[in-house]
Structures are given as structure tokens and as C-alpha cells.
């Protein structure tokens, strides 16, 4: 959400970052039909939502992290897919291509939006111009593939897009690059809740002091 917000800001769009990160949605003022809202919304919020509808919806993955809250996997998947169920035929959805549960849900339902299946193998030619170490991990690389697909759909300026991505340093304390040189990169991942949340970046690095 944060990198998409930064990209749209650099493109001189009127953009607001709200939801789980950023400001409360109802606190935003002076909005227009051209205002972009980048919303990080949880499955908990989606579960109870009856009127929320996004023109651009993103489902990065389906994990078992929130099963305790939703009681079972079916309830969790249904909550996530309210994003797509609330869309119309002028909306767009971006989902992980090789996720079994996501593909299964799409096959069983007739969603109205245009659905893009995204993976790192089909990143566009712009990816060759990127040199940001933040995206070295599999997880962040996957996030980047979604960003590039969304940017293409929005027809953003490619030069500004590349600059925004190359300058992105991540959220504070979450795989945040705080120093980078030829021989040393220092990454602050102190907000990690455990080994599992750091595993993606660790397995893509060498000579690690953790």
C-alpha cells in the first residue's frame, strides 16, 4: 500500500493512504472524483463490510494466519473475496496466479470485474531497469510484480515509476534498508514478529548477521 501511495504521489495524483496504514478513512477531506484512495483493508473488516467496493482490488495471498478469527478457511477465503464480489464490470482485480485457493474460488464464481493473474515470471520489461535491493526477497519481489501490473493498467509515466520504485526504502522497521554500500547493507527488520516473517528476505541474502 505504501509504495503504491508513493508512486501515485510522484505521478502528481491526488492520493490518500488510509485503512490499516495511514489515516482513518472518514478523516479525509477535500476529495474529488479524481482522488485515489489506497486502502489496506483486513479480512476482519471485509467480513463485516456491506457497502465497501473498490475499483482496483488486490489479493496478494491466502494464508492460514487468521483462521482463529474466522473459525475456518472457508470463512477466511469468503471474507477476502468480498473484494471481488462487490466489484462491477468496470472494476479490476489483481490476484496471485499460482495460488490454489485463489484459482479455485475464481473458477467457482462468476465475478464481474476483469481479473489479472500476477506472478514474478511475467513482470514487464521495466523490471530490468530496477536496482532496489529492497525487492531482493521473494515476498517483496512478488509485491513488485503487482505494482508493475497495476501501474501498467493505470498507464502511469514509466520514468517516474522507475524512480519511485528505486527510491523506495520500505516501511520503518519492516525490512527497511537504513544503509547501503558496495560491501554492506543494513536492514532494520525489528518489527518482525518472528523468524517466519523474516524468512523470505533471509533466504535471499548471503553473509548474514541476524
Model-derived segments and spans:
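Nucleotide phosphate-binding/pyrophosphate-handling subdomain across enzymes
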Residues: 14, 133-210
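Short glycine/serine/threonine-rich phosphate/pyrophosphate-binding segments
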Residues: 1-3, 24, 41, 194-198
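Short beta-strand-centered segment that lines the nucleotide-binding/catalytic pocket of NTP-utilizing
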Residues: 13-25
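Short, surface-exposed connector motifs at secondary-structure boundaries
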Residues: 11-12, 84-89, 205-209
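A conserved segment at the C-terminal end of the G1
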Residues: 1-16
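Flexible active-site lid/hinge loop adjacent to a nucleotide/diphosphate
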Residues: 25, 31-131, 135
